[in-house]
């Protein structure tokens, strides 16, 4: 079964969201996917977020583990910890869910977080995945542009039964893939969910179609891709590393 595109009743998380958090140290954004079984998988440019949620009497309760996936020495994270268990409670306000919470690993830091649904109804249908296809999971994705372009990007990507959902601090990814015998290929649409302020000017403001192909094993995958951004055609290489298995 592919990734569900149907949202449940108001007050219960389901599907793809962007999140924005505000703390005493600053703000940040990313993406989060909520499964029908109460699991959460997401992340941003530097960290992944994996956890679970429940809902009772209009209150959504979450426990999420934040783990660093990007360790480039030039990258300065907002929080110095490698891992932190975070707890939140939230309520629905229209389509959004507003959370408050924090972590004992980050004393004195209070998180005010808003989840806003992302429309993925126009995503391509799931691709065919063979019995030895790439494993379902949450992966980190590290991108490096080719052809002399000195640029790159990092984020997270959830692969599940031929469907792709993911993103980073500024962009969301929706797509599909097929995989068998150590080879995979697919398509992704890269969309800006939060203004990128020039962080990725090539993709900023565009809905970018991307086709890719490559190889995979039990630990991750890699591939080369071509992105069509406006009138430009841009090639890049992507490396995926499996972070966790996923559950419904």
Name the predicted role of every residue range.
Residues 12-16, 32-40, 56-59, 90-97, ...:
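Short, solvent-exposed coil/turn segments at beta-strand boundaries
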Residues 19-21, 40-43, 64, 99-104, ...:
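Short beta-strand segments that buttress and anchor functional surface loops
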Residues 2-26, 101, 124-149:
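Tryptophan-anchored aromatic micro-motifs
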Residues 2-5, 55-56, 96-129, 179-180, ...:
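Edge beta-strand at a domain terminus
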Residues 23-25, 66-70, 92-94, 105-107, ...:
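Beta-strand elements of well-folded, non-transmembrane domains
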Residues 25-70, 148-185, 189-191, 231:
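N-terminal glycine/threonine-rich, aromatic-flanked beta-hairpin/loop signature
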Residues 65-88, 188-213:
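An anionic, turn-rich surface loop/hairpin at beta-sheet edges
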């Amino acid at each position: 079964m592919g990734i569900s595109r149907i949202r449940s009743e108001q007050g219960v998380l389901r599907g793809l969201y962007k999140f924005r958090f505000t703390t005493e140290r600053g703000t940040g954004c990313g993406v989060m996917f909520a499964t029908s079984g109460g699991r959460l998988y997401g992340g941003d440019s530097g960290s992944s977020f994996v956890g679970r949620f429940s809902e009772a009497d209009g209150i959504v309760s979450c426990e999420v583990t934040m783990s660093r996936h990007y360790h480039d020495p030039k990258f300065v994270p907002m929080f110095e910890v490698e891992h932190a268990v975070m707890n939140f409670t939230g309520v629905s306000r229209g389509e959004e869910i507003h959370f408050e919470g924090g972590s004992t690993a980050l004393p004195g830091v209070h998180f005010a977080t808003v989840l806003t649904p992302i429309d993925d109804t126009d995503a391509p249908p799931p691709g065919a995945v063979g019995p030895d296809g790439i494993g379902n999971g949450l992966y980190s994705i590290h991108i490096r542009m080719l052809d002399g372009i000195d640029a790159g990007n990092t984020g997270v990507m959830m692969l599940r039964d031929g469907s792709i959902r993911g993103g980073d601090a500024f962009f969301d990814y929706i797509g599909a893939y097929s995989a068998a015998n150590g080879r995979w290929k697919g398509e992704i649409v890269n969309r800006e969910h939060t203004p990128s302020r020039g962080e990725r000017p090539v993709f900023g403001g565009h809905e970018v179609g991307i086709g890719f192909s490559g190889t995979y094993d039990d630990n991750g995958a890699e591939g080369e891709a071509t992105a069509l951004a406006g009138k430009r055609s841009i090639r890049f290489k992507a490396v995926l590393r499996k972070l966790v298995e996923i559950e419904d």
